[in-house]
From Swiss-Prot:
Annotated stretches, region: 66 X 8 AA approximate tandem repeats of G-P-N-S-D-G-D-K: 90-617
Protein name, per record: S-antigen protein
InterPro entries: S-antigen
Chief location: other
Sequence repeats: 90-97, 98-105, 106-113, 114-121, 122-129, 130-137, 138-145, 146-153, 154-161, 162-169, 170-177, 178-185, 186-193, 194-201, 202-209, 210-217, 218-225, 226-233, 234-241, 242-249, 250-257, 258-265, 266-273, 274-281, 282-289, 290-297, 298-305, 306-313, 314-321, 322-329, 330-337, 338-345, 346-353, 354-361, 362-369, 370-377, 378-385, 386-393, 394-401, 402-409, 410-417, 418-425, 426-433, 434-441, 442-449, 450-457, 458-465, 466-473, 474-481, 482-489, 490-497, 498-505, 506-513, 514-521, 522-529, 530-537, 538-545, 546-553, 554-561, 562-569, 570-577, 578-585, 586-593, 594-601, 602-609, 610-617
């Protein structure tokens, strides 16, 4: 065995000597040239001599340089693939200036200024200023200023100022100032200042200053400073100092000594002996014989024969024949012929000809010509010229000059000088000293001692059984069957089947199937199937299936299946399956399977399996070494 090894070593070194002296070096690369001493001969003045093949060493030096250029050109591709490891600045890399890279200035990159990148200024990027990016200023991005982005200022973005974004100022965004966004100032957004948004200042939004919003300063919102909101200082709100509120000392509150309260001795309370109470003998109570009660024979009750009840024959009831009821023939009912009803011919109804209705010609209706309606010419309407409307010139409207509006000069508005407004000095406003305001001691506010608040025992409160309350069976309440309530079947309610409600099937609601709602199937809602909603299937929503939403299946949404969304399956979303999203399967997303994403399986992504990505299955240095060694062996055999 030792003899065999000795002979093998002898033959090997003999081969090296012969090859070094007489062998070919024309086809060898830079490494073989170093091994076999070509530079040694050149350094020692032997460049003018000829080798055994009749070639000058000077010619060999030129051939060697050509081989080095060839090897460098072949290695350049590998170097471009290994720039994520070496920190160079080629395109589609991590930390360079090329397009579709991570941490550079190219498009579709991560942390650079290109589009569709992560942390740069390009569009569709993550953390940059491009559109459809994450954390930048481009559209459809995450954390930037572009549209449809996440955390930026573009539209349809997340956390920026663009529309349909998340956390920005654009419309339909999440957390920004645009409309239909999440956390911004746009309309129909989440956490911003736009109307019908979540957490912003728009109307029918969540957490903003618009009316009928959640957590903002608009009226009928949740956690904001508008009236009829949850967690603000507006009327019919949760956690404020207004009347009919929850947690204050006003009348008709929950947990206080006022009338229509919960757990006190006043009338219209819950668990006491007063009228309109829950479990007592007063009127408007729950489980008693008084009027406006739940399960009793009084008027305005739930499941009894009184007026304004739910499932009884009284007026203003739900599913009975009384006025102002839901599904009966009374006035102010839902689906009956009475006034103020839903789908009947009475006033203040939904889809009828009465006033305060939805889709009829009465006042205070939705889509009719009456006052306090939605899309009509009456006051307190949405999209009409009446007062207290949305997008009209009436008072209490959104985007008009009437009182109680959003962005106008009327009272009860958002951003105007009228009373009951947001950011003005009038009563029922947000941030002023008037009643029904946010941060003041006026009535109809959230977190104060006035009536019509949330956290007290009065009507229009949260957690009681009075009318216009949250969590009771009265009208305009949250969690009951009355109109304009939360979780009931009335119009403009939260969690019911009425329009402009939260969690119901009406339009502009939260968690229902209506448009502009939160968590329902309507458009511009939060968590529903409507467009421009949050968590629903509509467009421009948050967490739903609509477009421009957050967490839904719509386009430009956050966490849904729509395009330009955050965490959904749509394009330009964050954490969903759409394109240009963050953490989803769409293209130009962050952490999803789409192209130009961060941490997904798409192309131009960061940390995914796609091409031009960071953390993908690219060729490493070990692969390059294997290629070089394989090439050396081939050249050695060629030289022999």
């Amino acid at each position: 065995m030792n003899r065999i090894l000795s002979v093998s070593f002898y033959l090997f070194f003999l081969y090296l000597y012969i090859y070094k002296t007489y062998g070919k070096v024309k086809n060898t690369d830079h490494e073989l040239s170093n091994i076999y001493g070509i530079k040694y001969y050149l350094r020692n003045g032997l460049s003018d001599k000829k080798n055994g093949k009749g070639q000058k060493y000077q010619d060999l030096e030129e051939d060697e340089n050509d081989d080095e250029e060839d090897s460098n050109s072949e290695e350049s591709n590998n170097d471009e693939e290994n720039k994520l490891i070496e920190g160079q600045e080629g395109p589609n890399s991590d930390g360079d200036k090329g397009p579709n890279s991570d941490g550079d200035k190219g498009p579709n990159s991560d942390g650079d200024k290109g589009p569709n990148s992560d942390g740069d200024k390009g569009p569709n990027s993550d953390g940059d200023k491009g559109p459809n990016s994450d954390g930048d200023k481009g559209p459809n991005s995450d954390g930037d200023k572009g549209p449809n982005s996440d955390g930026d200022k573009g539209p349809n973005s997340d956390g920026d100022k663009g529309p349909n974004s998340d956390g920005d100022k654009g419309p339909n965004s999440d957390g920004d100032k645009g409309p239909n966004s999440d956390g911004d100032k746009g309309p129909n957004s989440d956490g911003d200042k736009g109307p019908n948004s979540d957490g912003d200042k728009g109307p029918n939004s969540d957490g903003d200053k618009g009316p009928n919003s959640d957590g903002d300063k608009g009226p009928n919102s949740d956690g904001d400073k508008g009236p009829n909101s949850d967690g603000d200082k507006g009327p019919n709100s949760d956690g404020d100092k207004g009347p009919n509120s929850d947690g204050d000392k006003g009348p008709n509150s929950d947990g206080d000594k006022g009338p229509n309260s919960d757990g006190d001795k006043g009338p219209n309370s819950d668990g006491d002996k007063g009228p309109n109470s829950d479990g007592d003998k007063g009127p408007n109570s729950d489980g008693d014989k008084g009027p406006n009660s739940d399960g009793d024979k009084g008027p305005n009750s739930d499941g009894d024969k009184g007026p304004n009840s739910d499932g009884d024959k009284g007026p203003n009831s739900d599913g009975d024949k009384g006025p102002n009821s839901d599904g009966d023939k009374g006035p102010n009912s839902d689906g009956d012929k009475g006034p103020n009803s839903d789908g009947d011919k009475g006033p203040n109804s939904d889809g009828d000809k009465g006033p305060n209705s939805d889709g009829d010609k009465g006042p205070n209706s939705d889509g009719d010509k009456g006052p306090n309606s939605d899309g009509d010419k009456g006051p307190n309407s949405d999209g009409d010229k009446g007062p207290n409307s949305d997008g009209d010139k009436g008072p209490n409207s959104d985007g008009d000059k009437g009182p109680n509006s959003d962005g106008d000069k009327g009272p009860n508005s958002d951003g105007d000088k009228g009373p009951n407004s947001d950011g003005d000095k009038g009563p029922n406003s947000d941030g002023d000293k008037g009643p029904n305001s946010d941060g003041d001691k006026g009535p109809n506010s959230d977190g104060d001692k006035g009536p019509n608040s949330d956290g007290d025992k009065g009507p229009n409160s949260d957690g009681d059984k009075g009318p216009n309350s949250d969590g009771d069976k009265g009208p305009n309440s949250d969690g009951d069957k009355g109109p304009n309530s939360d979780g009931d079947k009335g119009p403009n309610s939260d969690g019911d089947k009425g329009p402009n409600s939260d969690g119901d099937k009406g339009p502009n609601s939260d968690g229902d199937k209506g448009p502009n709602s939160d968590g329902d199937k309507g458009p511009n809602s939060d968590g529903d199937k409507g467009p421009n909603s949050d968590g629903d299937k509509g467009p421009n929503s948050d967490g739903d299936k609509g477009p421009n939403s957050d967490g839904d299946k719509g386009p430009n949404s956050d966490g849904d299946k729509g395009p330009n969304s955050d965490g959904d399956k749509g394009p330009n979303s964050d954490g969903d399956k759409g394109p240009n999203s963050d953490g989803d399967k769409g293209p130009n997303s962050d952490g999803d399977k789409g192209p130009n994403s961060d941490g997904d399986k798409g192309p131009n992504s960061d940390g995914d399996k796609g091409p031009n990505s960071d953390g993908e299955h690219s060729r490493s240095k070990n692969d390059n070494k294997k290629k070089k060694s394989k090439k050396n062996i081939i050249n050695m055999f060629i030289g022999m």
